[in-house]
């Protein structure tokens, strides 16, 4: 998909991408995993159909199959909606929390990072053809809804799903003005998300209630998890603050100060649940003291991955 310049090849790449992840989502054979894989398949198939319809209608009207030659207004709107559905932007976000909740943490990591690369590459290739008003409205709505819906969640995977929706809003709002900044934001988001998912997979935490006992068992890992969460929230002087600051700066240069102010205020909603995750991971203790050995060092290969990505984030 990334290297394609013909719509049929890009569509084929997206379909292969979708079919490859389905066995990983449903490998546990749990009813929730089956439901998640069904939702993912139906949503991605609908988005691919919409994408194909947009490219075919443009080819019918203009005679062009080249990705960069999408010029018809109707096709541009359909393309914007199709890629938004692929990524999980509001109002096409409905599938992402349920699919992440029904998937294992390792598969959820792939869904939140690597599986977003083909749609984001299509966004970059077709940025001149996208509808700017529609894209900006969906980006602001994603930042708002990602922060708002994450407030009352107790499942860590759903919290990270709404975090992903919110960060997608930050990426898409800057796409039309500075594509390189969008790539930087996506790269840093992937690094921080890999560190968080790997840590949660190591301490076997799926709920906030089970995260409370993490500090008594693995204090060093819980401390690094707190730093990564605060970086994902965008608190200075951590790494996650840099892309958000640069995005607000770029929007101000483009005379979009009201938009920059709105998304800066909406990011405070997300800050609350990041702080709640960090609070549960480090400050809270279980009600009953259990005498056991603290696992300061765990000899597992995944620890090298966690340490590397935590340092980078």
Language-model-derived ranges and their functions:
Residues 1-313:
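Core, highly hydrophobic multi-pass alpha-helical transmembrane subunits of bioenergetic inner membranes
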